[in-house]
Amino acid sequence: GVSRQAVTKWETDTGIPDIENIKSISSLFDISIDELLSNENASQKKSEHLFESVTEYDIDEPKRYDMKFGGAKRFVLCGYKGEKIRIRLVSDTLSTLQNDFKIKIDDIRKRIDVDVKRMNGVTEATAKEAVSIFVQIPSPYIGQIECAVNTETVEIHSLECDSIELDVKTSHVTLDDISGTVEINCNLDMEVLCSSLNGEVDINQISATSRIHIPENTVFTAVTKGIGTSISYEKDGQQTDRFDTSDSENIIELNGIKSELVIYTGKGRG
């Protein structure tokens, strides 16, 4: 098998996957290893989705990003070494993608506003079935990020920023190589996967039960705030005593009303 992170790093040009993943990606997309490793992979990637719409805008100083994407099947946000914000909408079924979605980018002093608007009567339900969104932000120019999206999966990769606030309706969140504070506002039950913890993850929920996976031996402090919130712990699918430490710089916080969070390592249940 090949991890979603490995595929995403190849799809979004944020890095060449580990060598053991290259063969898997090669067979997954029916692309030779030579083509994967050559500079020609950009043209190969275009054929990966039948339809796409790309919008780019030059960035020349650190900005605060306020982005509203509406509905999507999959949403991927990552930092990269370029100097443009790049928003790529892809679909295998919606041939009128370029006409049906308009991406508006406003540059207002220190702020970039991004708004994806559906046109021609396209519904959010259609967007959630047929459209995935890939966003790349230039790493040298990332300040704060606010991002709203309704989607099956949210993936955040290779970001170093003061804070990123996610207003989402999703059941799956992946945080891979993130440094800073991540705030997730979501009232659905979520599975949050952290490949590492370098900063703070704040989860704000009302009447929800979510799970967050962290690597074994991660040093962190767990904090509960709000009303009727609780955190429990699991290792390899078995409930266990709390295994956080006091006064760590890495924090996992649950805030909200009547919500539960399970912090777990190793294999999940089932």
Task: Go through each PLM region and give its residues.
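Beta-strand elements of well-folded, non-transmembrane domains
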Residues: 71, 91-93, 120, 151, ...
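Active-site alpha-helical segments that house and flank conserved acidic catalytic motifs
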Residues: 65-68, 147, 222-224
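DNA major-groove recognition helix of helix-turn-helix/homeodomain DNA-binding modules
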Residues: 20-35
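Right-handed parallel beta-helix
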Residues: 56-60, 76, 98-179, 242-270
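Recognition helix of helix-turn-helix/homeodomain-like DNA-binding domains
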Residues: 2-16, 39-41
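Exposed beta-strand and adjacent loop surfaces of beta-rich binding modules
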Residues: 84-86, 142-144, 163, 181, ...
